[in-house]
Amino acid sequence: MNIPLSDKQIQQLLRYLSLIQKWNRVYNLSAIRDPIESVKKHLLDSLSIIHFVQPGLLLDVGSGAGLPGIVIAIMKPEIKVFVLDSVGKKCRFMQAVKSELALENLIVVNSRVESFKPKKLFSQITSRAFAEASKTIQLTKHLLEENGRYLLMKGSNIEEEDVDNFNMKVHSMTVPFVSDKRSLLEIQL
């Protein structure tokens, strides 16, 4: 992956994983309970897209436990990252992470994506396990600025995605210690 990490980022990422484990017992944030699997399937998976993230406002839709949004906020403190989810308990968790890790660049939004009306539009929108690409675009295009782009994290079944009408690049992602195929759909409207 070749991603340089500062000591502070390492500590923040480890603390974040520990908070996921702690809160997951009560709030059911993720089906993944094993800490090692959490590192592989949450942390490393989210880190795999970090080189594709560019400067500008970023929105992570259907953020759930904050993946990949919180990881991006940790790795790119110069970028303002909005994490959006409609489930209150997940937003309370993300707010606790923001506070605990002192992530000044993270904004937690408890809203349905269709109802969200930001003051400024986003230059990039990410999602992981939210909806198929065409549905994600349909629900969020009112939030994307002109020439903005999507970074949609997907598995191997990208041929099932209905994205024929979009300017799209498909990146095959290699996530260390994860045998499942991963893809990143980079879509510009």
Per-region residue spans from a language model:
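Class I SAM-dependent transferase core
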Residues: 1-55, 59, 89-92, 96-106
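A general structural signal for well-ordered alpha-helical segments in protein cores
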Residues: 13, 43-46, 69, 122, ...
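Conserved beta-strand/loop positions that form the S-adenosyl-L-methionine
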Residues: 61-63
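Conserved SAM-binding loop of SAM-dependent methyltransferases across substrates and taxa
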Residues: 65-78
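S-adenosylmethionine
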Residues: 79-82, 86-189
